[in-house]
């Protein structure tokens, strides 16, 4: 029976659904768990304390304990809220995170969706979360939620452009929009004629990498870009009226998105699953590739969270000035320089 089932030719949409479900279980949940634990342990060490220690060995089951706590809480809906939109908003945000997983390769033959415009798809679906945040802010029927939702929308729109422009330098240098092609371009490339370690784009596209990390920080609405949920000003912004399971979905979405953006940065700038000095077409990477990618993801996540615990919150005017007067001009200059060097060299 098993061989007969394996021999059945599945339709493309069926294959996509199966890969998506596997991606949710095999990638998104572990990524969210790892990033969550890493965040709390890192925050604890920076504050000279131990952090979570009771739930599992060394606090490794802390996320499950948090999930159990939230599932026991009452799921309230404000009386004046738009009930349908209010309930759908967390799922829209989570879908954005989930779709990002599908285009990130973990080995030469390990991918969920391999399309020629993979990076374009990743950037497109990353902006879906704006819709969910606006839905949450508007449907809650609360002034704090609405202000938080509008702040988040303005912030995400402002920083989506630097994010896209930062990636364009990578696309120009790699000569492809395909995520697997970008990894292979780094594995087989050269740094000004020297190919000893390939060409990790963090070296030749360091400006783009820095812009990408700052823009990701703003997309995640984490400090110092946490104006949409500023507790001292608007309680918790668009999350104010959420509790129980729906608050948990936002909670999981935040940390899973941080992990997936870190994996995306690792793929675009650190060579993804590739290890310098080895043959990128070797089947070995189908075995060790996921672990290599996970290690690089943790490295980028450390950088993202380091900013979170180091810098104070920006004002709204400072946030917009940083995007429009600093990051966008820098990203455009990076594209021009990359294009010129691509033609000359």
Model-derived features: positions:
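Selective transmembrane helix interface/packing segments
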Residues: 2-345
């Amino acid at each position: 029976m098993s061989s007969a089932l394996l021999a059945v030719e599945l339709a493309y949409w069926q294959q996509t659904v199966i890969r998506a479900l596997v991606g949710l279980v095999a990638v998104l949940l572990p990524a969210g768990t790892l990033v969550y634990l890493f965040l709390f342990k890192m925050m604890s060490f920076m504050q000279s304390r131990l952090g979570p220690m009771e739930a599992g060995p060394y606090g490794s089951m802390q996320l499950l304990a948090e999930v159990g706590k939230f599932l026991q809480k009452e799921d309230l809906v404000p009386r004046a809220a738009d009930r349908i939109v209010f309930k759908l908003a967390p799922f829209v945000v989570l879908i954005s995170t989930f779709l990002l997983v599908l285009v990130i390769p973990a080995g030469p033959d390990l991918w969920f969706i391999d399309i020629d415009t993979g990076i374009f798809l990743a950037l497109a679906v990353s902006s879906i979360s704006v819709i969910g945040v606006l839905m949450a802010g508007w449907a809650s029927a609360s002034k704090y939620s609405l202000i938080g939702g509008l702040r988040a929308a303005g912030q995400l729109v402002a920083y989506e452009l630097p994010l896209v422009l930062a990636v364009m330098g990578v696309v120009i240098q790699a000569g492809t929009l395909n995520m697997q092609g970008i990894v292979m371009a780094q594995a087989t490339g050269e740094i000004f004629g020297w190919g000893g370690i390939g060409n990790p784009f963090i070296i030749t596209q360091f400006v783009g990498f820095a812009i990408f990390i700052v823009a990701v920080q703003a997309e995640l609405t984490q400090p110092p870009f946490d104006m949409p949920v500023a507790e001292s000003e608007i309680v918790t912004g668009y999350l104010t009226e959420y509790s129980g399971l729906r608050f948990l979905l936002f909670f999981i979405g935040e940390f899973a998105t941080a992990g997936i953006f870190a994996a995306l940065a690792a793929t675009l700038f650190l060579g993804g699953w590739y290890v310098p000095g080895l043959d990128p077409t070797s089947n070995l990477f189908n075995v060790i590739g996921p672990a290599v990618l996970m290690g690089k993801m943790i490295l980028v996540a450390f950088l993202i969270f380091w900013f979170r615990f180091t810098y104070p919150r920006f004002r709204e005017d400072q946030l917009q000035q940083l995007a429009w007067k600093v990051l966008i001009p820098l990203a455009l200059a990076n594209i021009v320089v990359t294009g010129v060097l691509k033609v000359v060299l």
